[in-house]
Structure formats: structure tokens, C-alpha cells
């Protein structure tokens, strides 16, 4: 299934959390912090959003940092994604 976001929305997939701490302790699944770094898998067209022209600054494949509580989590074909607005993205990781 393909997902096509509307307006200034983007679809992201979280990157995997670290399995070990810096000191080498292996973390169980429940102790891992959800990462705030993700890869963009789909980008909306931008355009007129809330009466303002929005140009999309991100593209598919970009690695980004995003606000911890931003967007809506969805499950598609067994995979977890987050749909959020472009302004919830804090930075592009280069």
C-alpha cells in the first residue's frame, strides 16, 4: 500500500533505538527510549495551508529530528509510521 500525505504533512518511519547503552548494558525493549530521529518516506505537495503558502523543505530519504509528541502514529501493512506536519520537524540530519 502507498500512502500519499496531503498539504504540508509528511510520513516518517522512526529509526531503531539503541540496543546498548554507552557503557555496554543491553536494554530490554521496554527500557529503550523512542528515538526522535526518523527517515522521511512520503512528502505532501505543500501549497496553501491555513491561508499561507507552504513550500516543502524536506524530501523522501531525508533523516530528520522531530518533536517527541508530534504527529499521529499509524500502522500500515504491519509497519509503524508517523504522519506529522512539516513544522513539527526540528532539523534535517546531514
Swiss-Prot record:
GO terms for molecular function: ATP binding; metal ion binding; protein folding chaperone; protein-folding chaperone binding; unfolded protein binding. The keyword Chaperone applies. It is found in: Cytoplasm. One of its GO terms (biological process) is chaperone cofactor-dependent protein refolding. The keyword NAD does not apply. InterPro entries: Chaperonin_GroES (IPR020818), Chaperonin_GroES_sf (IPR037124), Chaprnonin_Cpn10_CS (IPR018369), GroES-like_sf (IPR011032). Belongs to the GroES chaperonin family. Heptamer of 7 subunits arranged in a ring. Interacts with the chaperonin GroEL. This is Co-chaperonin GroES.
